[in-house]
Amino acid sequence: DTKMYLEVVEEWKRREEALISEEEKQSLTEALIKMLPENGQSYVIDGKESRVDSLQRYGEFLQTQVSFSVEACLEEIRNSRADDKEEPVEKEETLPDNVSKEQKAEGACRIGNTYYEDLSAALHAVKDNETIYIVQSHAMKDSFVYVEKTRTRKFQNVRILPEGGPRTVRMPDRHRLAFTKSSVAIGSKGSDPLTFDLSGTSVPDSDNLYCGAICANKGSSVTFENCVFQNGDQLSRWMIHGEYGSVTVDQCKFQNCDNGVGVVTEASSAFTPTEISFRVQNSVFDGIADIGAVHFSIHRANIRAEIQNNVFKNCRIGIGGIRSDEAPYTGPISARIQGNTFQNCYIGESFSQGTSVAASAFQVNVSNERYHGWQSTSQHPNVGDLYSGWFSTGFCNSNVEASVNGCSYENGVHGIATMSKGRTVVNNTTLARNNAREANTEQCGQKGNGGGIFLNGGTIIWNSGTICENQADRGGAIYLKDGEILLKDGSFYGNRAQNRGGGIYNQNGTVKQEGGNFSANTAEIGSGVYQDGIYQMSGSALVDEGNDVYLPAEKYIEVMQKLQSVPAARVTPDRYENGRMVVKVNYGNRTGSMEWERFLLTPQSRYCLRPGDYQDRRAGTLKEAVTISSEYTVQYDKNTKAQVEQMPEPSVKYWYEKAAVSEQIPKWLDVPFLGWNENQTAKEGQYQPGENLPAEKNQDLTLYAIWED
């Protein structure tokens, strides 16, 4: 109904202090009426067709019911005015007594009808629940910072918005914004972008209370929406810095900062511990250096971080742009990293401080990440896309929990790297075409290892996913130097090691394979697995027969539960000698005969695999072992030139195992058969048909038939 819409217009005029002409009012009314449904139904609020007491409520109602859009109405009015040949008559503006036209013309910001020369001046004047409008792009003439208690300003629910189009605030040398115990919302997703140009800003490390270009200090709550932060080359610290409280970054862009960090939040031990809320989402980080695009450093506070649906590209430092640092830290962390995309990112100097951590809880959830083309340029341990303080544990030395779900790490240096202690759970993740041989980590003594996974301490639980077509000097798919990895399922194929361990290189670590298949991997030694630690197999675990498990001196495979595949693996020992244990059965009755048929031995001469419980005690082998054994041939000689019927076929005897003489009795006319003897000229039988040969007869034998004279 028209009357109601006119009331809406009046309410709009009153609440927004807009100067709406009668012509504009009529056009707006007509536009609103056009947006009613065809049946002309009128709408009411709270059951009344009377005065509307809230334009916002009515707008929300109309948006839901009739797709009402104030922006669409205004656009229609602007278009109609542009087509009108008559110039509109400007209404004389009434200025407050304390504002002259000259002041308004020179003012870059306004609060209500009061204008201020720059953003800093407006912040010194703003009160709770007020909005600062940036009406002109300008350079700040002074900082708004926390220096002394007498200069500290606190305010709540203040907004900072651009007005009349995109606006830029340039921050000259040493000029910055630092909010203290305040709540501020900067920018809006529904407004034009607000840009902060930091090209002249330098922030020395000594200014540790407000060492970012824009700071949320002492428990402030600051939200950034639809903002651009650029040209931070002179920064020695951060574009956005939060310390205790809440920082939210949504739909923002950070670009061209070769000497700083995009977003950082921290909790210094100099202040009372509290909880930090840290959220970065729907934003773009392009060309961020120093210690990462997003960084959080905590000392004693509890922290909740959410980093979601961002794009990180060309970020040279920090795990594809995300990194954390603890020094020292004792409180709990909960971090969720989800739906981010990383392109052409590097890792540089990482975790140069903060090696003392005793966290009560460190929980990180990483999901739906896409990493493409990152590199390692650091002299620190060779890690690739993610390192340490996130889902890998790094220098966090206790109680670290992390999960990685539905991620893809491709065309980088390493897929996943975990250092020190901790526990990482991986689900439905792909590590593909990474090349650890390109890592620049010579000073660590670990250059080029672990194309898919680099594990040096801690635990990784791989529930599902694929590790394929990665390259490394050692450990094409997985490299372990200490630590433990549990493989429950997955496909590990096409990985290549220049030296050892095409699938896995295990040096002093523990591999527990309960499922999954290694196939088509290549290496000079150990195409499937190079096992120089502990390697346990069970269930559906499989190393395809085209790959092998190489066993250095005194190393073997442990079978923890019944294996399903036949064969489950092919083993290659460092040396072929009788009694060399290659498999140990560690479940049930613990006898080698329970599993020995599920393993193959890479062929060499007469050697084969036999169960230890079949062997004589004089062999010195364990009953739970599967060992290397020699295979001996037992031949039967009729010991006459005459024709003999029913001669036994050759049989086999194994090292330190008993073997039965054939039960078949040869027949030579009516000449009585006396038995078999190793001596061709013997007069009596040494062995009778069906009798066992001695276990210690570890040689090829020819048994001669002995006939009665």
Regions found by a protein language model. Name each.
Residues K181-V184, G219-S220, G245, S269, ...:
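Small-residue (G/S/T/A) turn/hinge positions that recur once per unit in extracellular repeat modules
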Residues D128, M140-E163, T168-P193, D197-T223, ...:
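Extracellular beta-strand-rich solenoid/capping regions of secreted or surface-exposed proteins
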Residues I628-D709:
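Secondary-structure capping and domain/repeat boundary segments
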Residues L119-V126, M140-R153, H175, Y535-S540, ...:
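Short, T/G/N/S-enriched strand-turn elements that build extracellular solenoid repeat scaffolds
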Residues Y133, R159-L161, R170, A178, ...:
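Extracellular beta-strand solenoid repeats
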Residues M4-H124, N368-T393, V400, G406-C407, ...:
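Extracellular/surface-exposed low-complexity segments
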Residues D142-V145, G165-P166, P172-L177, L198-C211, ...:
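Short glycine/acidic-rich loop motifs that flank beta-strands on beta-rich extracellular proteins
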